[in-house]
Amino acid sequence: MNYDKFIQDFHLIERRGEYDEVHIWGGPYFGFYESRMIGRNPIFCNAPPLVRPCNNFVIMGFNYERGISEALEAFAHRVESILAHNYPTMFRAYQRQVGTVHIPFNTTKDYDWSNETMARYRNYLFPNFTPTNLLGRMANCQEWGCTGIGYMQWWLRNLPKNVWKTILEVKNV
């Protein structure tokens, strides 16, 4: 996908005050990234940043041949990029204790959503970015229903509440 042409054709720079972000749905091989940040000071957002003369915004690219689980995964990769940039220490700890978008806390394999191995996780350590209980608790895929979409929802739901503004309001990232 030619991002410059897309931005020009839809006058996204001139109309920047009319939207918070842009979502594109397309088919396979349309060539867009899952997420890309555009603006004066964009960061890597699961794709190379694209510097343009406007406040930052994100273009999300979704494939209509894929499911809601994959759309949530694309969004979760955006979350990973933004949090790794803004809160690197906290986010590394979160990933070690809760898991990454691809790898739940109770496995070492990508996409192993139905793993019933019990393991310790500490999701509730991060409501204010400070550990309060180093023990955590034992759990497995039953936490998210042992499905991909369940894991994406669970992973996003366990993020600290005070990071959502950073994730969604990227104009000043």
Protein language model regions, located:
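Short catalytic/ligand-binding loop motif for oxyanion handling, primarily in non-cytosolic enzymes
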Residues: G31-E34, E80, Y87-P88
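Active-site-proximal beta-strand/loop segments in catalytic clefts of secreted hydrolases
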Residues: W25-Y29, F62-N63, S81
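Active-site-proximal segments of metallohydrolase catalytic domains
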Residues: M1-C45
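Active-site recognition of the HExxH zinc-binding catalytic motif
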Residues: E65-N86
